[in-house]
Amino acid sequence: RIAATQGTALNQEIKETLKPKYADKVNIYDSIGPSGKVVITITAKAANKGEALKVSCDHLGISLAEVISFGDAENDVAMFEITGSAVAMGQADEIVKAAAKTVTGKNTEDGVAMAIDRILKTGSP
């Protein structure tokens, strides 16, 4: 995994340069780094949250259809595509929200707790 923080405009320029050349070999997307800043993340094509979740669920004997995934960055989309339900956080980019089945509040507004509360009350996020 390679991550770099350069600033939003430069990040966009870097992604636009790299994606056409390397999209078949690596994943290139924005994510939130430990500092809370947006970083460009580059990973091997097979290294994604969806693949990691498949392995974890298989090991635990849990069906992916029973899993609800939460995310706010493009690196969560692979996970959204394989789980029974996918919830985007309110601060997520539009591409992430479009990939989710529903959108909850922002992480600063206890969005995960809001979704869990809805699940407990209605059976659906």
Task: Please tell me what each predicted stretch does.
Residues 1-70, 74:
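Conserved acidic, metal-coordinating active-site core of Asp-based
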Residues 43-125:
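Mg2+-dependent phosphoryl-transfer enzymes with acidic/Ser/Thr/Gly-rich catalytic loops
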